Amino acid sequence: MKIALSCPASLPATQFGGIMFLCLDIAKESSKLGHDVTIFTTDLDFANNPKTFNKKLPRIEKIQNFLINRSHVWFSIQLFFVNPGMYFQMNKQNFDVIHTIGIRSFQSLVAAFIAKKKKIPLVISDQGGLTTHPDLTSSLTKK
């Protein structure tokens, strides 16, 4: 089965946390079962802050038995990273299923558009909570 995974960050941005680790775990385990897996993500490098993007990271990188396909972020609004190149990368390929992780992201929107356009099943996994994110103000929960 050819599987596309979509998430806002991947290696080397390990500080990004849960979404990235969940995506990597799914990629590792699925590829061990013989599936053809590609992670579509940004070029977030994280280098001590969540706004460091690195155009020098390989656009396509093979790690273990899966691929990481990165595209450059044009701009970001807090942790909402806009990388339109991901749409074109995903649109060029055909997948049996698309799995997006972290639904409050540009990458999930792209995955949903591609799935709808190409009539590919879409799996959505959320990770984290809207009111627990450290970058959001506490005014969301104040009464």
Feature map (PLM): residue ranges:
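N-terminal subdomain of nucleotide-sugar transferases
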Residues: 1-55, 64, 120
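Structural motif
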Residues: 4, 97-99, 125
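Histidine-centered beta-alpha loop that forms part of the nucleotide-sugar donor binding/catalytic region
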Residues: 8, 101, 126-129
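Generic structural signal for helix capping and beta-alpha/helix-loop junctions
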Residues: 13, 47-49, 78, 107, ...
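Short amphipathic alpha-helical segments
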Residues: 18, 51, 110-113, 137
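Generic beta-sheet signal
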Residues: 40-42, 71, 125
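An amphipathic, basic-hydrophobic alpha-helix
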Residues: 54-56, 60-100, 105-113, 117, ...
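Nucleotide-sugar donor phosphate/pyrophosphate-binding loop at the beta->alpha transition
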Residues: 121-123, 130-143
